[in-house]
Amino acid sequence: MATTNDLKNGMTLDLDGELWNVVEFQHVKPGKGPAFVRTKLKHVLTGKVVDKTFNAGVKVDVATVDKRTMQYLYREGDSFVFMDTETYDQYHIPAQTVGDAANFLLENAEAVVALHEGTPLYVELPAAVELTITYTEPGVQGDRSTGGTKPATLETGAQIQVPLFITTGEKVKVDTRTGEYLGRANS
């Protein structure tokens, strides 16, 4: 149990039996009337974002979320199998829970899995990963009608936009949050 004055970004709240992550918060002290806290909350399971206002000092339930480092092993049907690197327990996590992180997951890659009472909530990847381009069209010198980028397929099957000078077989850095090309990998 905490108060709204203790809110921080990334905190997970239990509101009416549902889990919400605090995306943004702002303490507001108007000239007239009581202080309040304006928040932007993201539903952990659905990803829905809502604005919610709390009176300052009101008690809220903080959910205990255990973030554990896990290794991605393989995909089995509609679920991804992760292994806890400390206990060696295996978790079958549905594709819906993994979300967009699936586009950048390679076998044996490490990720942080958030657990609430033993149930996986979401998967966090590092901010950037290095992946190999499996296919891209050759870039033609002087072809600028597309703004200097072209589509490329990664070894995970995901498609991203890369500069014209990138060729098939090259390793590139990709931002896992936006799916954008960051540069060539330092290998």
UniProtKB/Swiss-Prot annotation:
Keywords, alphabetical: Cytoplasm, Elongation factor, Protein biosynthesis
Localisation: Cytoplasm
SUPFAM superfamilies: Nucleic acid-binding proteins, Translation proteins SH3-like domain
Pfam families: EFP, EFP_N, Elong-fact-P_C
SMART domains per the UniProt record, alphabetical: EFP, Elong-fact-P_C
GO cellular component, as recorded: cytoplasm
UniProt keyword NAD, yes or no: no
InterPro entries reported for this sequence: Elong-fact-P_C (IPR015365), NA-bd_OB-fold (IPR012340), Rib_uL2_dom2 (IPR014722), Transl_elong_fac_P/YeiP (IPR020599), Transl_elong_KOW-like (IPR013185), Transl_elong_P/YeiP_cen (IPR001059), Transl_elong_P/YeiP_CS (IPR013852), Transl_elongation_fac_P (IPR011768)
Pathway in which this enzyme or protein is active: Protein biosynthesis; polypeptide chain elongation
Single GO term (MF): translation elongation factor activity
Keyword Cytoplasm: yes
A Gene Ontology biological process term: peptide biosynthetic process
Similarity annotation: Belongs to the elongation factor P family.
NCBIfam families the UniProt entry points to: efp, PRK00529.1
Role: Involved in peptide bond synthesis. Stimulates efficient translation and peptide-bond synthesis on native or reconstituted 70S ribosomes in vitro. Probably functions indirectly by altering the affinity of the ribosome for aminoacyl-tRNA, thus increasing their reactivity as acceptors for peptidyl transferase.
Protein name: Elongation factor P
Taxon lineage: Bacteria, Bacillati, Actinomycetota, Actinomycetes, Acidothermales
